[in-house]
Structure formats: structure tokens, C-alpha cells
């Protein structure tokens, strides 16, 4: 990937569910090493926007670019993509590691098997190489000692760390986190945020939908505040948290900080 080229671009993204307009033409650019946090009230469109970036939700309009691959979205009356190469979308998805709030691990596989699955069967990489790298990523997230366990034997925080290792194993250009701590007991939140902070320090490109304001303030290079499907405020953490210009953003922050 060209070092001068943005890692991820979402431009003028619109999304409707029936007659309800969820996203009203919002844009984001993440350059290499950026950590972009998306904050806002529940129902503001944060997760929908994130899911549109890798086509888990199909935008009704917009442009998504990952490295040198891009899709300019056109849809029919039913909201289905038209004139788009599905293989291009698959190539884009492989460059975006996704971490969900609900872990989404395969319950019938061990921790190690979960992390190896994508590189083995999607990337078709050699098993020995995949296993070694999977153990390295499990070690990175502090859970290599649980490689033979099954997800049901782990705490929520441990399961989420496995899902982060699984995303890393695909060696993506960027990581997308959809409220990665919201399903966790409060005492387990810290262990997951510690891993994500470590990834930020390594220079990984990340887009994080989060309710953890301290994390967004301390780790982000850029913060977006969404309100009713629009970007109401954006800037550096200092600009957004210390000197927001939007009354709605000020009200939101005063209620959560």
C-alpha cells in the first residue's frame, strides 16, 4: 500500500432502513497509524457506519476505499448493490479486521483453532506458519496459556481478547472495533482496553466505536461525534473533549464525563 494513500476512506455514506434515514452522508478518513474513535448516543448511527465500511451493512450511497480498492455504491430500489464486483468487496473485507461487541467466536473450536481458521481457509496459508503466528498473537493479547481452551471456558474479557487475536491473524490494514467492551462486566473492561491501547502504540490503524470516553480522549488521533446520522463534531481529542463547538456534543459529554 502506498504510504501516502489513506488506509481507509468512507465518503458521503448514506444508509436507510425502510423509510428511516440512519446515515445522512457522513465521511471518515483514516491514514496509516490513525486511531479514530466514534462516539455518540445510542441510536446515533455509530455501529451502522462502522458496518457499512466493510459491507456488513450495504450503504445506499457513498464511496468506500481500502488502500487501492474502492467501491462507489449504487443500489437498486430494494437497496441491493448493483454493478459491483463481489470479489472486490471480499478483497476489501480481508484488509479490515472486525471485532464485535458479542465476540462471535466459534464455540466448537478451541481458542487456537479460532485464531487459525481465517488464515488457513481464507488466506490459504501453510498450517505451521499459521499456528506459530496465531500463538504470537495470543501471546500479544495475554492469553496464550488458554490456547487449548474453548470459548465457553473463558471470561468475557478473555473471549474478547481472543477475538482481537483472531482479527490480527488476518494481518489486516485496519481494525474496526464495534463497542468492544460494551458486553463486558465492568471489572473486565480494563484488560481489553489495555490490549487496544497497546495496538495503538504499535501504530495500528483503527476505527473504534466506543462508549469509553477516557479511552477515546487518551488514545485517539481523531474523534467523531455522531448525532442523528450526521457528524456533529470532529477533531482532535483536545478539540472535541475540551472545546466542542456543538451544543449537542457539549451536552453529551457533560452527561458521560
Swiss-Prot record:
It is found in: Cell inner membrane. One of its GO terms (cellular component) is plasma membrane. The keyword Ribosomal protein does not apply. ATP binds at residues 40-47. Coiled coil: none annotated. SUPFAM superfamilies: P-loop containing nucleoside triphosphate hydrolases. PROSITE patterns: ABC_TRANSPORTER_1, ABC_TRANSPORTER_2. Residues 8-253 form the ABC transporter domain. It is a peripheral membrane protein. Keywords: ATP-binding, Cell inner membrane, Cell membrane, Membrane, Nucleotide-binding, Plasmid, Transport. It comes from the Bacteria. GO terms for molecular function: ABC-type amino acid transporter activity; ATP binding; ATP hydrolysis activity. Pfam families: ABC_tran. The keyword ATP-binding applies. Belongs to the ABC transporter superfamily. Signal peptide: none annotated. This is Nopaline permease ATP-binding protein P. Component of the nopaline active transport system probably consisting of four subunits: Q, M, P and T. This system is also capable of transporting octopine provided that catabolic functions are induced with nopaline.
Amino acid at each position: 500500500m502506498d504510504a501516502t494513500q489513506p488506509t481507509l476512506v468512507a465518503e458521503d455514506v448514506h444508509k436507510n432502513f425502510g423509510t428511516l434515514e440512519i446515515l445522512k452522508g457522513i465521511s471518515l478518513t483514516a491514514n496509516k497509524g490513525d486511531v479514530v474513535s466514534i462516539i455518540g448516543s445510542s441510536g446515533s448511527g455509530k455501529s451502522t457506519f462502522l458496518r457499512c465500511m466493510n459491507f456488513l451493512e450495504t450503504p445506499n450511497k457513498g464511496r468506500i476505499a481500502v488502500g487501492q480498492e474502492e467501491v462507489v455504491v449504487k443500489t437498486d430500489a430494494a437497496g441491493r448493490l448493483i454493478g459491483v464486483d463481489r470479489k472486490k468487496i471480499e478483497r476489501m473485507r480481508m484488509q479490515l479486521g472486525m471485532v464485535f461487541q458479542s465476540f462471535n467466536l466459534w464455540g466448537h473450536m478451541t481458542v487456537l483453532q479460532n485464531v487459525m481458521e481465517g488464515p488457513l481457509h481464507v488466506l490459504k496459508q501453510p498450517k505451521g506458519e499459521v499456528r506459530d503466528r496465531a500463538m504470537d498473537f495470543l501471546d500479544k493479547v495475554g492469553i496464550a496459556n488458554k490456547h487449548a481452551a474453548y470459548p465457553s471456558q473463558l471470561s468475557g474479557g478473555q473471549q474478547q481478547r481472543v477475538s482481537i487475536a483472531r482479527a490480527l491473524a488476518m494481518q489486516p490494514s485496519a481494525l474496526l472495533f464495534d463497542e468492544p467492551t460494551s458486553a463486558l462486566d465492568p471489572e473486565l473492561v480494563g484488560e481489553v482496553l489495555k490490549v487496544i491501547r497497546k495496538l495503538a502504540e504499535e501504530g495500528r490503524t483503527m476505527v473504534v466505536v466506543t462508549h469509553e470516553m477516557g479511552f477515546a480522549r487518551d488514545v485517539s488521533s481523531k474523534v467523531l461525534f455522531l448525532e442523528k446520522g450526521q457528524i456533529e463534531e470532529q477533531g482532535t481529542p483536545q478539540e472535541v473533549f475540551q472545546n466542542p463547538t456543538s451544543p449537542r456534543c457539549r451536552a453529551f459529554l457533560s452527561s458521560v464525563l
